[in-house]
């Protein structure tokens, strides 16, 4: 009997679909494509037939299947060469490992304590005291609230006046098992042209408003540091709070000064000389002696109701009116609309002192550098009692605390090089000072805060002054030994109520009188006119803070 087995293998022709994977991480968009090879147009299909004939009784013939061999091809590209030394310690759970030499105990350092509160309520963080014997660079902690979108934060900000190579430490995080560890690293950065550079920042995208925590370099000097007991009122879920240490030797929160090496330039620009020397700064910051009553200053913006720049004659007459109302200072937020020239001329004629500002917008500190340059060139220091770098820049998410501290330090150096000997600060709400005082205290000569009692729903107009005084008392404990100025305060005369805080013309008059009686000598009232060019804002009050007519 003859049995035959016919084994036929047919080739299959087909197509494959291409797919595209879109990945996003830290603001960098990458596109990866995977496509199947396309058959040539002239390719044909073929068949191979194999016939095996076996004589004998029918039976099954096993067909041996060859064992496939695996060939692996790898292409290796070395981006960074790193040499590491790993020590593995294995300890028995029942018998502790012994060593011939005692292990060095871990020395606690006064790094900020990070606490996450999952729910709302009032929490108390106990006090802690740490003594440091050696100078150490550590990773501090900073938080910032980011609105939905892509943001860049952290890093070390430096200003260079020539092509320079900068060597500086920076803080970052590295994976450690299932967690991450904050570490200090050193980087070399080439600044090809003069300007402001932020070294080793972090870029991320958040779908909703998010509070992020990131490391910042800090130098801890020998001394005793105390983290005082803190009572925190949490009004939102999943809230992160950073509790800083303070001590007799306040840690330097700003990054260590980078060392620089000048890069040879092809051309050298000569610094223009001038025959007239800039007037030196003979005035000091507005007095903060603890006296109450009075009206130190008022904010002034040279904009029309439509947001355009006012003409010079309007600015001169309006600023002169401040003097007749009994004010001694005028606060200016930025250098646009010829603010320095027009308001400066009016201040000199009227005998007013100026609190001038460097406004940081959504473009960050790099976009504010031109204002630093403009102020340094203007240099009418005898008119200036204080320079405010940033107005709620952290609160608005325009930069983080570490970046702001670095920018304040570099701006102060630029002003001093131009002859300024007065004080420099920034201004933020009290919650920002509480969270980032350890970062800002070292670079600010005084504490500048914007204290608006209207935004506390439990404060009525007649209690506005007492509320502001209490807030100032709290601020005085954040940077010990430094004065506090209330650089923006007032009450709206129109809009919607916020609990007990009710806007209105009579309520505005009551609130401003209360603030003036309690802390008027250390307060700047907001603002000269209504800002009708602004968005309505929360409670529809943002446009209606004009209060010049409240003062006789």
From Swiss-Prot:
Enzymatic reactions: Hydrolysis of terminal, non-reducing beta-D-glucosyl residues with release of beta-D-glucose
Subcellular location: Secreted, Cell wall
Signal peptide: 1-18
Bias type Low complexity, positions: 251-289
Enzyme Commission number(s): 3.2.1.21
Disulfide bonds: none
Annotated segments matching region Disordered: 250-291
Principal place of residence: secreted
Cited function: Beta-glucosidases are one of a number of cellulolytic enzymes involved in the degradation of cellulosic biomass. Catalyzes the last step releasing glucose from the inhibitory cellobiose.
Protein's recorded name: Probable beta-glucosidase btgE
Organism encoding this protein: Neosartorya fischeri (strain ATCC 1020 / DSM 3700 / CBS 544.65 / FGSC A1164 / JCM 1740 / NRRL 181 / WB 181) (Aspergillus fischerianus)
């Amino acid at each position: 009997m003859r049995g035959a087995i016919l084994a036929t293998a047919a080739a299959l022709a087909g197509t494959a679909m291409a797919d595209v994977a879109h990945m996003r991480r830290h603001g960098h968009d990458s596109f990866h494509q995977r496509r199947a090879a396309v058959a040539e147009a002239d390719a044909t299909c073929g068949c191979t037939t194999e016939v095996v004939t076996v004589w004998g009784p029918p039976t099954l013939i096993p067909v041996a299947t060859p064992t496939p061999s695996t060939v692996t091809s790898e292409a290796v590209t070395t981006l960074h060469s790193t040499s590491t030394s790993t020590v593995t310690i294995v300890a028995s759970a029942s018998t502790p490992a012994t060593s011939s030499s005692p292990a060095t105990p871990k020395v606690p350092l006064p790094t900020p304590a990070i606490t996450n509160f999952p729910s709302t309520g009032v929490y108390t963080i106990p006090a802690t005291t740490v003594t440091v014997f050696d100078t150490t660079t550590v990773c501090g902690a900073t938080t910032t609230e980011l609105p939905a979108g892509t943001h860049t934060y952290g890093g070390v900000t430096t200003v260079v006046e020539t092509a320079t190579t900068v060597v500086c430490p920076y803080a970052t995080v590295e994976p450690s098992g299932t967690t991450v560890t904050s570490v200090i690293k050193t980087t070399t950065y080439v600044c090809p042209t003069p300007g402001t550079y932020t070294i080793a920042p972090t870029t991320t995208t958040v779908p909703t408003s998010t509070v992020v925590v990131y490391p910042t370099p800090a130098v801890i000097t020998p001394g005793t540091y105390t983290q005082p007991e803190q009572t925190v009122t949490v009004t939102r879920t999943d809230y992160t709070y950073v509790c800083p240490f303070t001590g007799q030797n306040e840690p330097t929160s700003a990054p260590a000064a980078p060392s620089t090496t000048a890069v040879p330039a092809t051309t050298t620009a000569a610094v223009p000389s001038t025959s007239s020397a800039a007037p030196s700064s003979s005035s000091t910051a507005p007095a903060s002696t603890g006296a109450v009553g009075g009206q130190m200053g008022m904010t002034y913006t040279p904009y029309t109701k439509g947001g355009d720049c006012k003409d010079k004659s309007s600015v001169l007459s309006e600023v002169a009116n401040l003097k007749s109302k009994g004010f001694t200072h005028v606060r200016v937020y930025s250098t646009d609309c010829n603010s320095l020239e027009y308001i400066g001329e009016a201040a000199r004629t009227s005998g007013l002192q100026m609190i001038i500002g460097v406004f940081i917008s959504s473009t960050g500190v790099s976009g504010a550098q031109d204002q630093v340059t403009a102020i340094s060139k203007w240099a009418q220091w005898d008119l200036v009692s204080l320079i405010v770098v940033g107005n709620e820049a952290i609160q608005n998410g325009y930069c983080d605390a570490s970046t702001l501290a670095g920018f304040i330090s570099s701006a102060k150096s630029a002003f001093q090089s131009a002859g300024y000997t007065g004080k420099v600060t920034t201004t933020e709400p009290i919650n920002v000072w509480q969270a980032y005082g350890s970062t800002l205290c070292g670079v600010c000569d005084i504490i500048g805060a914007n204290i608006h009692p209207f935004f506390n729903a439990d404060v009525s107009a007649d209690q506005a002054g007492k509320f502001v005084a209490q807030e100032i008392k709290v601020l005085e404990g954040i940077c010990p030994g430094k004065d506090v100025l209330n650089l923006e305060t007032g009450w709206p005369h129109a809009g919607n109520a916020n609990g007990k805080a009710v806007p209105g013309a009579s309520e505005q008059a009551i609130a401003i009188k209360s603030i003036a009686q309690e802390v008027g000598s250390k307060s700047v009232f907001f603002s000269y006119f209504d800002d009708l060019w602004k968005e309505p804002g929360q409670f529809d009050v943002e446009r209606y803070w004009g209060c010049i007519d409240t003062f006789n």
